[in-house]
A protein has these predicted regions:
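Alpha-helical cap/lid subdomain in secreted, periplasmic
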Residues: 1-163
Length: 163
């Protein structure tokens, strides 16, 4: 997303270089070419991070989703529109979004571990954890709750059933 996060990701994952959009485009195409012997390949778009469609992180993700869509079209590969389907569901939100994605590590960890505690210790569903934080699909603004998982399940099931 930015230079610092790219450097951190490179270091934490022992990558040879900082991930870039240009490398993503190139490597996605190469990966599909390597998988060409597999009879059926399907790509899916990336889910949002946070639930504000016009946030800078989701604008960044849209760039990658456009690349995924274009690659699927160019290579004649099926596409599961995960992102579009999740945004459609977010339009059905029954309560206002209270806060949105904060890229700082400490707030992310608080949301993740807080969600885990509420789910596993207090036995709240992921959707209830999300609701308690003013979220609809992403209980910690990153990971899907049951509502979001059902959308991806239905997309996948429909794709498998159709062919």
């Amino acid at each position: 997303f930015n230079k610092n996060s790219g450097e951190r990701y490179k270091r934490n994952n022992s990558l040879p270089e900082v991930p870039t959009f240009e490398n993503y485009q190139k490597l996605l195409s190469e990966l599909i070419d390597r998988l060409s012997t597999i009879p059926k390949i399907v790509l899916c778009t990336l889910p949002p991070i946070g639930e504000h469609q016009n946030s800078s992180i989701n604008q960044h993700i849209n760039k990658f989703n456009d690349c995924i869509k274009l690659t699927a079209q160019e290579k004649n590969i099926s596409l599961l529109p995960v992102s579009d389907s999740l945004w459609d569901e977010l339009d059905k939100r029954l309560y206002p979004l209270r806060s949105d994605y904060d890229p700082n590590t400490l707030p992310i960890l608080r949301r993740i571990y807080g969600g885990i505690i509420h789910h596993y210790v207090f036995k709240k569903s992921w959707d209830k954890v999300a609701e308690s934080k003013g979220q609809w699909l992403l209980f910690d603004q990153i990971h899907l709750g049951e509502r979001g998982a059902k959308i991806i399940y239905k997309l996948t099931k429909n794709y498998i059933s159709s062919g």
